[in-house]
Amino acid sequence: MLLFVEQVASKGTGLNPNAKVWQEIAPGNTDATPVTHGTESSWHEIAATSGAHPEGNAELSEDICKEYEVMYSSSCETTRNTTGIEESTDGMILGPEDLSYQIYDVSGESNSAVSTEDLKECLKKQLEFCFSRENLSKDLYLISQMDSDQFIPIWTVANMEEIKKLTTDPDLILEVLRSSPMVQVDEKGEKVRPSHKRCIVILREIPETTPIEEVKGLFKSENCPKVISCEFAHNSNWYITFQSDTDAQQAFKYLREEVKTFQGKPIMARIKAINTFFAKNGYRLMDSSIYSHPIQTQAQYASPVFMQPVYNPHQQYSVYSIVPQSWSPNPTPYFETPLAPFPNGSFVNGFNSPGSYKTNAAAMNMGRPFQKNRVKPQFRSSGGSEHSTEGSVSLGDGQLNRYSSRNFPAERHNPTVTGHQEQTYLQKETSTLQVEQNGDYGRGRRTLFRGRRRREDDRISRPHPSTAESKAPTPKFDLLASNFPPLPGSSSRMPGELVLENRMSDVVKGVYKEKDNEELTISCPVPADEQTECTSAQQLNMSTSSPCAAELTALSTTQQEKDLIEDSSVQKDGLNQTTIPVSPPSTTKPSRASTASPCNNNINAATAVALQEPRKLSYAEVCQKPPKEPSSVLVQPLRELRSNVVSPTKNEDNGAPENSVEKPHEKPEARASKDYSGFRGNIIPRGAAGKIREQRRQFSHRAIPQGVTRRNGKEQYVPPRSPK
């Protein structure tokens, strides 16, 4: 046996007592059988049987026992000791077991030592405190366990730590709860709730200066129960408290039926309910938030966000964004939760941030989406020739005009037409911004609105460049129908177009003749009858020079093209006469002011501006009349009328007519390609541009029938010619 102890000591000092080595050795020795049930009992047994052995072995066993006690809990020790009792017959093992039972017995003796009445009294005080007004205003756990009728399960109350320290008997707890006037137990004895006493009678419209004895004197009667207290509350209200609800109801009936008046006034009385724990007439306002309050100490901002859908229809304080928000655990959700969905003051404060953000976003985006169709819808919607031609001619610098249309200094050289376009642009932009400012407050709606607007802009702008590009290569044929008003009859229209083909070829030939002989035309005489005709021709060029210098360069190119063709047709009509000296250029200046307005009106005819005398109408009248003179116009050379072309060119090009003289043989096709590639502006000579216009006019229908003098809207300002 001694050897066994030494082996155990050598192996067990540094090992776990639960190691398999102990269990393997135990079956081989009958004395060590209790080891399987509890090592501590075996050590006690060894210590008892080894009384004659050296003290070192006993000390070793005690050390091992101490180490074992540290490693195991008391509950595990108790279970092991109880199993050891069953198999061991030695009485010394019962020491620890007796100790554990003594601890239990001591607790029982302490309960029995305290009288039952004292226990009930302590339990009653604890339960009444749990259901008191002060505790329920802070105890979120009890509030969370209440149902819609403020009932709490009794087993919930019995499991509270304060109650468990006193007793665990549910019958005793139920008995104490039924005896307490502060709570009310249901019929089954399963639930309990705070008792709402209605034992206070409120007397209204009684001044505070009224002596309290007079108020109490109202209830001094045999038919009225005894008054417990009488006090002034506020606003001329007096509170008279009675013992129970029955007494309060009896006193209320007594005042209404017997007393009726006090100080010459009818008595105004009502019964007030005493809320023993909360000032808000019950808990029904907190039902929606009871399950989120326990989390409030950990995440205080999670509860109000969760409660927003519940209180959304009843947000009484949504207008006041300055109301301070309390995030304390104090459960007053009636005031706290309606304010909780508005931690962001900018949303409540007049919806300023969504509106200003929308306006700024629209202002930043007004460059690209709106510039695309700012100029093009002008001539697309119009039926006039000026804007239609502008759409076809100005494609070369369409990108430049598209992105710089809001650049006012860049367009200061063309105020006539660009001013109108800019005005239309600003009006449309302003109306769009007003709709955006007032139309939407929500972010989702704003996004949908912006997407819908951009889709509409894309539908407007995408098809349009394709149509304009399709017009660009063939402007002579696509623009035939839009340049002229409908004529009364088609019979007079068809011969005009046939004469156009016969005559424009001669016009082109005449152009090259006048370019070759340009040096010799200044001193040639012109007949007296032709003086006014030349003056009118100069007036045409002079009048078109002033507005066209102020327009867009594309418009100026188109307008000068038309006027020079008309000038050449007038020159050919004037060649039938004998030559006399040309009238001085000063004769054209008095009529310049009078002829400028019809030209401007013709320019703005397509943009729905009121016109007085468009040239198209006069052409329709001319086409309906039969030719008066024979078609022997181009027999004579055109050099006599070179001054009519040179002088207006000087006015247009600011004294640079030499450009048209130096480049007389430049091909019209090359000039047309330059015209499309962006070389339109003040750099292009007007004389060279005239060749392009006359080349284009071969396919146009503005030519005058043979032998017929050009008659347009400006003839009303031209003095009549002398008879032949």
UniProtKB/Swiss-Prot annotation:
Residues annotated with Phosphothreonine modification: T578, T579, T649
A family per Pfam: La
UniProt biased composition (Basic residues): 444-453
Segments of this protein annotated with the region Interaction with the poly-A tract of mRNA: 111-303
Biased composition (Polar residues): 415-437, 574-600
Gene Ontology cellular component list: cytoplasmic stress granule; cytosol; membrane
Region listing for Disordered, in residue ranges: 374-477, 568-600, 623-724
GO biological process annotation, one example: post-transcriptional regulation of gene expression
Source organism superkingdom: Eukaryota
Leader sequence segment: none
Record note on what altering L15A does: Nearly abolishes interaction with PABPC1
Coiled coil start-end: none
Keyword Membrane appears in the UniProt entry: no
The HTH La-type RNA-binding domain, residue ranges: 113-202
Annotated GO MF terms: mRNA 3'-UTR binding; poly(A) binding; RNA binding
Interaction with PABPC1: annotated span: 13-22
PTM-bearing positions, type Omega-N-methylarginine: R368, R686
Biased amino acid composition, Basic and acidic residues: 660-674
Location(s) in or outside the cell: Cytoplasm, Stress granule; Cytoplasm, Cytosol
Residues bearing the modification Phosphoserine: S392, S505, S583, S597, S647, S722
Record keywords, A-Z: Acetylation, Cytoplasm, Methylation, Phosphoprotein, Protein biosynthesis, RNA-binding
Phosphoprotein found in the keyword field: yes
Residue positions where N-acetylmethionine is found in the record: M1
Function: RNA binding protein that binds to the poly-A tract of mRNA molecules. Associates with the 40S ribosomal subunit and with polysomes. Plays a role in the regulation of mRNA translation. Plays a role in the regulation of cell morphology and cytoskeletal organization.
Oligomeric and partner information: Interacts (via N-terminal region) with PABPC1. Interacts with RACK1.
Protein name: La-related protein 4
Name of the gene encoding the protein in the UniProt record: LARP4
